[in-house]
Amino acid sequence: NALVQTDTMTILMLFSNAGIILVTLLFCKLIQKRKVTTVGFQKPDMWKEYLTGMGIGFGIFTAAVLLCVITGSLKIQGMAPSFSIGIFVLFLLGYLVQGMAEEVLCRGYFLVSVSRRYPLAVGIIANAVLFAALHLLNNGITVLAFINLVLFGVFASVYFVKRGNIWGVGALHSIWNLAQGNVYGIRVSGIQTSCSVLSSEMVAGRELINGGDFGLEGGLAVTIVLVVGTLVLLATRQRRYVED
């Protein structure tokens, strides 16, 4: 079955991101002489931050889904017949690794490193562009999709700085991806999976809103939730700084 083979490859790819975490942490420790805490692995309230991040990640993506449904850009057709709890759990664990890996690389390493030498705003923009560039070879990438990926990078950076740890933003990123592909059955940055809780259909002619072949990350619904989310974060009190 081609779809099963595709899911197997996707799951293996997700777990392979553990290598990014390991290499990044080793580079920070051995080359930059940084403590692990400077990457954002702070102990205080670790589980609370992680669970909060999971909830926010699911919530903001669901907000984008609702925008698409309200505007007639997405139809949720009900429970997906191909759902498998075993495959779903593997995707969940895989995305927990993948989401954290991208956050460790882009926020924990790159943002902190750049911000030590330049203003924080420079670090935020630079790592957001790097994050978006990592997805340039994905299927269905468009100019709006790239802009949204930059916006996600900015949103994640502000969340990281405001919360002062990597746990929350890593969880947020992971569940954002899981919600797309394996809850709502929508392409994750152009990647399609066969195992999802719900079956959804992109409405033709509404690609500007729903993102078309790239998934919701390529449409204006995600643009709106990320801009609003970032503005809300900027208005909140900063919890603590990541340790220098």
Where are these regions (language model features)?
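Hydrophobic alpha-helical transmembrane segments
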Residues: I11-F15, Y50-G55, F88-V89, A121-A126, ...
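Membrane-helix interface segments
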Residues: D45-W47, S84-I85, R117-V122, T142, ...
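Membrane-interface helix/loop boundary segments of multi-pass membrane proteins
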Residues: A101-A126, V158-N165
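Small-polar-interrupted transmembrane alpha-helices in polytopic inner-membrane proteins
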Residues: Y95, P119-L136, L149-G153
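Functionally important transmembrane alpha-helices
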Residues: A145-L208
